[in-house]
């Protein structure tokens, strides 16, 4: 005989789901603890869950602009891995677009001077090492080029999830969006990192959201990550 749901059983079921989600979050966070970067774990978890939500958006690729040492790449690729584990289907790959020579702030004397950039001039070897340690190599395809160069070789395939985290200037954010968002179909998502923490990114995103054409709307976010869904 089927039991009637009560407030108590509903609360217990809700908490059970919450705890299961927390376990997934914590396991992923610990898996990527070896990768340095400026992505808050809550932001990474949101990216991971978006990448795994294939039933909630159109078919297409996952593309990130700006990969640095691979932290966001790991979160995104882990979402694809969960799709493969859950369905057995080919989940595709994360296309990691980056020249790997760092943004202006990572150079010697920059606001966020990075030892790897200063010493080796590239984070690509460390990026590959980090992806390999996370067991995600088969789910990541490196596109070693600047964003505006890489888009020239893009196949034209739809992009269901686009993550923009490259050069944080207003002009670069605007240009990255203009170059890549045209491949995002209605129902697809574009994510911006460092909203409300970097002036250039913030200014562009505010302009985009105020655009009368309303091609994108804000649907969720975490820390400095803003998620916009294409509606037109």
Model-derived features: where do they sit?
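N-terminal auxiliary segments of SAM/dcSAM-dependent transferases
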Residues: 1-13
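Short helix-coil-helix linker/hinge
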Residues: 40-41
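S-adenosylmethionine/decaboxylated-SAM
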Residues: 12-36, 45-232
């Amino acid at each position: 005989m089927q039991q009637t749901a009560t407030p108590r059983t509903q609360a217990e079921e809700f908490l059970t789901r919450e705890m299961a989600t927390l376990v997934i979050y914590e396991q992923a966070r610990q898996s990527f603890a070896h990768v340095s970067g400026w992505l808050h774990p809550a932001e990474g978890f949101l990216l991971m869950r978006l990448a795994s939500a294939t039933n909630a958006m159109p078919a297409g690729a996952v593309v990130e602009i700006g990969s640095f040492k691979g932290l966001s790449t790991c979160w995104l690729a882990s979402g694809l891995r969960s799709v493969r584990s859950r369905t057995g289907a080919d989940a595709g790959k994360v296309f990691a677009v980056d020249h790997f020579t760092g943004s202006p702030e990572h150079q010697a004397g920059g606001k966020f001077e990075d030892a790897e950039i200063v010493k080796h001039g590239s984070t690509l070897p460390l990026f590959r090492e980090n992806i390999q340690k996370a067991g995600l190599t088969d789910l990541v395809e490196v596109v070693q080029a600047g964003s505006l160069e890489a888009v020239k070789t893009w196949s034209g395939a739809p992009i269901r999830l686009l993550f923009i985290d490259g050069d944080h200037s207003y002009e670069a954010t605007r240009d990255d969006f203009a170059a890549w968002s045209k491949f995002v179909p209605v129902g697809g998502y574009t994510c911006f990192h460092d909203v409300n923490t970097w002036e250039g990114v913030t200014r562009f995103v505010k302009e985009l959201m105020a655009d009368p054409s309303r091609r994108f709307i804000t649907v969720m976010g975490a820390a400095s990550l803003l998620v916009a869904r294409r509606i037109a």
